[in-house]
């Protein structure tokens, strides 16, 4: 079981506005979910061709890396290839389900949602915290920026927890899912939090996150007999989400020199992503919160704080309603993209049993409803980035002019019919891509629509996670709660259709804390 601690943050309200924190999961508290295997259809998303299953690779095909904690085993299996849109073709509806601080504990939620993904032909992104592969007795190997060696706001792990997490990471990758990073110690706020780190400090944090994944056999000698992780993490790691959604600017400046191709640490609206400083900026999104006068971030923790405040186990009589509210909000968000601009829907989650596990139920029901629809692809961030890179830059430029829920007035065939689909051949394989598509980046800057600017969080020095109206969201508190998971990610909830902050129409009827 993961030995993690959690720092709970209080919500902040300015007048009638609610500043909500996006949570980050470690080991949860309460509840349990079975690790069901689901039904493996062995097909790509709605018939897309996949790389062949890896199975048991011949010994001579496995190239151990370093101490044998990781290995090169060939192209990732079960990963559909990215294809360029034909002229006039309607874009797929992408949906990304992602998990912050992914690790397997006694709740068995990692294994459970692997089964859910297989059942509904979904691929997902698991943002692994590096310290979840570092045992408590070796904690001094972690040298966090601006903190003493061995310090972590989410604790470390034990041998059993490391073994279980490795098993899930190994299986997830072989099933075509992505292993990203949530970095290490999860420090938030003004006192040495990630939002205060320099570019060089971020480079150190990224290097250490990689090192813990690449050296778990050395650091946990009891597990030397375990199979290696079947990938080269230096090549596998292409994206992240920062703790508390802080520090994005300097993190990206560091990460872009270390092979990263995307980041999901921002706050935005349901519009098509663009590149920022050569990296795809694919933020969490503001989505409807049924019955409320404002929208909330597309993450389970944000719904929870708007419902039960910072109490992770609120009124049991409200649990079912709260889960339904989250599910219905996500489904409304899906519908306005699916029937509108087809912008990818980005959803963040945590392996937690907050409010009796109601958010896990909500996510599972959402997956079941959206991933089975025609034209929908439930993909990892890697797959989404591959698809974006494969497109004609002029096509992407037109897509970015569409506002939230805005379908082309003349229809997709006419709207995208003038694009030259054969301008350059799409890459055959999604497993590896190199370099920055400068043409795509420049093309996506053209024709910015009136709604495109909505939801773009403005970076300031140490300014991520600001409350609506300019007030800073409160940093996580300092008193750890035993075995409660990670500190929450910070991000503001906004009034509908404006990620930069508008006043709520009235008091928050659900009683979110202020």
Give residue ranges: language-model regions:
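Active-site beta->alpha N-cap acidic-glycine motif
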Residues: 61-178, 185-189, 212, 219-253, ...
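C-terminal domain-boundary segment and adjacent tail
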Residues: 68-74, 78-79, 125, 262-274, ...
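Well-ordered, non-membrane alpha-helical segments in soluble/globular domains
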Residues: 109-111, 158-166, 202-207, 323-332, ...
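Active-site cleft segment of glycoside hydrolase catalytic domains centered on the general acid/base Glu
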Residues: 190-208
């Amino acid at each position: 079981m993961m030995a993690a601690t959690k720092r709970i943050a209080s919500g902040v309200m300015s007048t009638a506005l609610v500043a909500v924190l996006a949570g980050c999961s470690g080991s949860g508290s309460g509840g349990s979910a079975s690790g069901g295997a689901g039904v493996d259809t062995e097909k790509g998303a709605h018939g897309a061709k996949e790389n062949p299953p890896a199975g048991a690779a011949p010994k001579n095909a496995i190239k151990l890396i370093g101490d044998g904690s990781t290995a090169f085993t060939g192209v990732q299996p079960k990963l559909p290839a990215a294809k360029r849109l034909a002229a006039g073709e309607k874009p797929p509806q992408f949906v990304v389900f992602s998990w912050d601080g992914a690790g397997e504990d006694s709740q068995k939620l990692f294994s459970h949602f692997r089964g859910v993904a297989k059942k509904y032909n979904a691929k997902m992104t698991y943002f692994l915290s590096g310290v979840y592969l570092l045992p408590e007795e070796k904690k001094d190997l972690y040298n966090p920026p601006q903190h003493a060696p061995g310090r972590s706001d989410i604790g470390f792990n034990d041998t059993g927890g490391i073994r279980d997490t490795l098993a899930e990471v190994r299986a997830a990758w072989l099933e075509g899912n992505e292993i990203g990073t949530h970095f290490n110690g999860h420090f938030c706020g003004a006192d040495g939090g990630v939002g205060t780190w320099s570019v060089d400090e971020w480079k150190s944090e990224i290097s250490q996150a990689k090192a813990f994944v690449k050296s778990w056999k050395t650091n946990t000698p009891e597990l030397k007999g375990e199979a290696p992780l079947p990938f080269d993490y230096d090549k596998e790691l292409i994206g992240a989400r920062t703790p508390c959604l802080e520090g994005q600017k300097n993190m990206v400046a560091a990460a872009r020199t270390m092979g990263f191709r995307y980041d999901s640490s921002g706050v935005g609206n349901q519009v098509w992503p663009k590149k920022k400083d050569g990296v795809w900026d694919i933020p969490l999104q503001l989505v409807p919160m049924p019955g409320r006068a404002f929208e909330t971030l597309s993450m389970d923790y944000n719904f929870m704080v708007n419902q039960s405040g910072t109490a992770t186990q609120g009124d049991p009589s409200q649990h079912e309603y709260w889960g339904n509210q989250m599910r219905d909000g996500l489904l409304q968000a899906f519908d306005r993209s699916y029937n509108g601009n087809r912008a990818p829907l980005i959803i963040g989650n945590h392996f937690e049993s907050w409010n009796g596990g109601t958010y896990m139920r909500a996510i599972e029901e959402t997956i079941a409803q959206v991933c089975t629809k025609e034209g929908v692809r439930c993909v990892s961030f890697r797959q989404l980035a591959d698809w974006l890179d494969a497109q004609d830059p002029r096509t992407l430029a037109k897509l970015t002019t569409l506002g939230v829920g805005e379908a082309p007035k003349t229809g997709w065939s006419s709207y995208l019919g003038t694009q030259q689909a054969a301008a350059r051949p799409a890459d055959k394989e999604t497993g590896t891509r190199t370099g920055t598509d400068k043409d795509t980046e420049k093309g996506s800057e053209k024709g910015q629509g009136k709604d495109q600017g909505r939801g773009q969080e403005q970076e300031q020095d140490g300014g991520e996670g600001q409350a609506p109206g300019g007030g800073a969201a409160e940093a996580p508190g300092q008193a750890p709660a035993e075995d409660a998971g990670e500190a929450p990610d910070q991000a503001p909830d906004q009034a509908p259709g404006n990620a930069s902050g508008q006043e709520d129409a009235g008091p928050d009827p659900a009683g979110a804390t202020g």
